[in-house]
Amino acid sequence: MKQQQWCGMTAKMGTVLSGVFTIMAVDMYLIFEQKHLGNGSCTEITPKYRGASNIINNFIICWSFKIVLFLSFITILISCFLLYSVYAQIFRGLVIYIVWIFFYETANVVIQILTNNDFDIKEVRIMRWFGLVSRTVMHCFWMFFVINYAHITYKNRSQGNIISYKRRISTAEILHSRNKRLSISSGFSGSHLESQYFERQSFHTSIFTCLSPVPSSAPSTCRYTIDVC
């Protein structure tokens, strides 16, 4: 069966390229952000602005590169798991990748908004936004293939479960009918052996009765009647 293609690629090929793209894009993003976020500027919050939102914003700004590094490491692991999920057709791995990429890009947008004002050079701010928007758009493009392949994998797994369920039912029916035939045949053979046993017993009893000694006053003749079935 010919698989449907989009932009000259099947859903499986697009999913593989999505994982490869994510790994390469995350590496390039870390190289670029290490120079600009490595020495994050942390400023102490004055009591006037000591609110919950200000504390959270200051924490994100101070730990921005460490947060980006942690998220990128998790993203690379999930991308590798995506490639294995394509090979092994694991539906859960595809779903994890879809959910995580959405969370990863959302977190990067938040970090970008909070830290972009710290750079005085306008070109740096433009390059950071250009890289983030380009990566997000490409992830949306590749996500189309991942979602389609996840749908195909789920459908194939459902069909496989139905086939295995029907196979188990047919196997159980065959075993039940076989056991039923065996019980019927064993019943017939048992009744036949029982009838033969009683016939032999009656035959031996008649012979023993005929050969047993009789009184002298009784007739000396003995009639043998043997019925053979």
Swiss-Prot record:
Membrane topology qualifier: Multi-pass membrane protein
Ranges that cross the membrane: 13-33, 67-87, 94-114, 129-149
Subcellular location: Membrane
Entry-listed glycosylation sites: 39, 156
Gene Ontology CC annotations of this record: membrane
Main location: membrane
Record keywords, A-Z: Glycoprotein, Membrane, Transmembrane, Transmembrane helix
UniProt cross-references to InterPro entries, sorted A to Z: DUF4534
Protein's recorded name: Transmembrane protein 217
Species in which this protein is naturally found: Homo sapiens
